[in-house]
Regions:
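C-terminal helical "tail/cap" subdomain of flavin- and related membrane-associated enzymes
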Residues: 298-376
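Conserved N-terminal helical subregion
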Residues: 20, 48-170, 375
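Conserved mid-domain beta->alpha element of the FAD-binding
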Residues: 10-17, 138-139, 251-330, 334
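Conserved Rossmann-like nucleotide-cofactor binding loop
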Residues: 11, 36, 144
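Conserved N-terminal glycine-rich FAD pyrophosphate-binding loop of Rossmann-like flavoproteins
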Residues: 34-54
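Beta1/beta-strand and adjacent pyrophosphate-binding region of the FAD-binding site
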Residues: 1-11
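Glycine-rich FAD pyrophosphate-binding loop
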Residues: 20-41
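Conserved FAD-binding catalytic core of PHBH/FMO-like flavoproteins
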Residues: 133-241, 247-250
Length: 376
């Protein structure tokens, strides 16, 4: 079988490595514009239980190969904070890895297995020819996939552009922080959200997110991420943290969530963010990419008929991702209104509000009933 993959992100690379491991006679070619995936937005991933299981099925020694020169902290707890409250909760065990580390490991693994990586940017008009030249074409080219756009009607694509802006940073201080951190700090402009994962004991990959209105107000108005750092450091250090953000030289991005009604058209299939992309609060992360890649590879290993394999892949993934997609959309809509949610809630309840999101109305009702003696 001859397979071409457009894009060398986690989904396409994992698929190529896994399938080539079990079908070394398959001819797999990845088309990737030089450094495009490596330089794409985002600076890291958190690998949790399912991710490590899937990596181990491809490479029993993946951890040693991934971290050959250093040790990364194991994450077992999540720290939630607002301006004046905090709570530590259990976290599904995992560890963080930089984007560069993960992609370099997967690229090296792919080439060692005989996968061809070609330095070429595929244009939309070239996709039909690829479909003629190969038995199967995978669009693994990320959230702005050219195949997704070219076949949007056939694939029944949908996207939701949230009224939220985010960007990536690193935080490096003397303070040790090995938890996954989720902060929501209220300010004059609105609520600033911080999500971070430890790369070392003293360094974290950080996402800062806020509503469009928040970014367009007060001290943040008109400021690029680098210019906003002094204000963000001051605000986010008010509850016991040492925040000293380092810019990733990336702009503010508008968050976009992708979904599809169908994952393939003829002999072309979508994989990874090209098909589904979720807000981080849905708890999916790189798991979606690995799960889709593994599922498609399994379908091809069990079905010599490509059409049947793609039909099974489509059914399995849409079944698997229906609920995460609903959760992601629900949370995105909640975050779009987070400034208002905090404004109408007493500060003593901000942490519970943040933790329970759209269920908080029931939380308040329950507490009110208990306070009046109705609750038993």
């Amino acid at each position: 079988m001859r397979i071409s993959i457009v894009g060398a992100g986690p989904a396409g690379l994992y698929f190529a490595c896994y399938l080539k491991t079990f079908k070394p006679d398959f001819e797999i070619t990845i088309f990737e514009a030089k450094h495009e995936s490596m330089n794409d937005f985002g600076i890291g991933y958190t690998l949790q239980k399912l991710d490590t299981i899937l990596l181990e099925r491809m490479d029993a020694n993946f951890y040693q190969h991934l971290f050959c020169n250093e040790v990364t902290p194991t994450i077992t707890q999540a720290l939630f904070k607002t301006n004046n409250q905090e709570r530590t909760l259990p976290f599904s065990e995992g560890f963080s890895v930089t984007r560069e580390q993960l992609l370099e490991y997967l690229m090296n693994k792919a080439t060692s297995l005989g996968v061809t990586i070609t330095n070429k940017k595929v244009l939309p008009k070239e996709l039909p020819q690829l479909q003629n030249d190969f038995d199967l074409v995978l669009a693994a080219d990320g959230i702005s996939s050219i195949a997704r756009e070219l076949y949007k009607d056939e694939l029944e694509t949908k996207e939701h552009k949230a009224k939220l802006k985010f960007s990536w940073f690193t935080n490096k201080t003397e303070q040790e922080r090995t938890e996954a951190c989720f902060y929501a700090f209220n300010s004059a402009e609105g609520v600033i959200l911080l999500t971070s994962y430890p790369l070392t004991k003293n360094k974290q990959a950080v996402v800062i997110e806020m509503t469009d209105n928040c970014l367009d107000s007060g001290e943040l108005k008109g400021k690029e991420p680098t210019q906003a750092i002094p204000y963000l450091n001051k605000l986010l250090s008010e509850n016991g943290d040492e925040i000293s953000l380092i810019p990733a030289n990336l702009p503010w991005y508008t968050f976009k969530m992708n979904t599809v009604g169908k994952l393939y058209h003829d002999n072309l299939a979508l994989i990874g963010d090209a098909a589904y992309s979720f807000h981080y609060s849905a708890g999916q992360g790189v798991t979606t990419s690995f799960s889709m890649a593994y599922t498609l590879a399994q379908c091809l290993l069990k079905n010599s008929n490509i059409n049947l394999a793609l039909a099974h892949y489509n059914h399995s993934i849409n079944l698997l991702l229906t609920e995460p997609a609903k959760k992601s959309l629900r949370h995105m809509e909640w975050f779009e209104n987070i400034d208002q949610h905090f404004r109408i809630t007493d500060s003593q309840h901000w942490l519970d509000l943040f933790l329970q999101k759209d269920e908080f109305g029931q939380f308040k009702k329950t507490n009110k009933e208990c306070n009046t003696g109705v609750c038993r």
